Regions:
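Gly/Ser/Thr-rich active-site loops/lids in small-molecule metabolic enzymes
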Residues: 14-33, 37, 78-95
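Conserved active-site beta-strand-loop modules that form the wall/rim of enzyme catalytic pockets
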Residues: 11, 17, 58-59
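A conserved C-terminal secondary-structure "cap"
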Residues: 56-130
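Generic alpha-helical secondary structure signal
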Residues: 16, 44-48, 75, 108
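Single conserved hydrophobic/aromatic residue that forms the stacking wall/gate
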Residues: 2-9, 13
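Short, function-defining helix-loop hinge/capping sites that tune catalysis or transport
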Residues: 11-14, 71-73
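A contiguous pocket-lining binding segment that forms or flanks enzyme active sites
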Residues: 20-55, 71
Length: 130
């Protein structure tokens, strides 16, 4: 079974499960999201790990805790946060009904979207699922 609970948290985001939940996601966060595995919040170690990931991603999720977002201004940052949260909510609802998605956005759909919206998407995220 290929479901959220049988994969590691990092794999969920590397595979861009969030992108597949809402069409606007690859346009709003084309680099994907970074994930910090569970760590004690509030300490230096988690701050350093988060800062490292924020160099690459505009969104970093703390496993079992929360999310950090960065943008050019408040409105863009709030919109980013809202888009990620909405996509995660859709994903959770889908996976609560079935472990396998019955339909999804294909890699070629993502490539077309990227072309039309003039964004670059990492090819490593664009592959056919087995």
């Amino acid at each position: 079974r290929d479901c959220l609970l049988s994969r590691g948290l990092g794999d969920v985001y590397k595979r861009q499960e969030l992108w597949e939940s809402a069409t606007e996601c690859p346009v709003v966060f084309p680099d994907g999201v970074g994930v910090v595995g569970w760590m004690v919040p509030g300490g230096r170690e988690i701050a350093i790990k988060t800062a490292e990931l924020m160099k690459k991603y505009d969104v970093v999720i703390w496993a079992h805790h929360g999310m950090f977002c960065s943008g050019e201004d408040f409105d863009l940052t709030f919109g980013l946060l809202h888009t990620v949260e909405k996509s995660a909510e859709i994903l959770v609802k889908i996976l609560s009904m079935t472990p396998n998605k019955l339909q999804t956005i294909t890699p070629d759909n993502f490539r077309s979207l990227a072309k039309d919206f003039k964004v670059s998407l990492p090819e490593e995220f664009l592959y056919e699922k087995q």
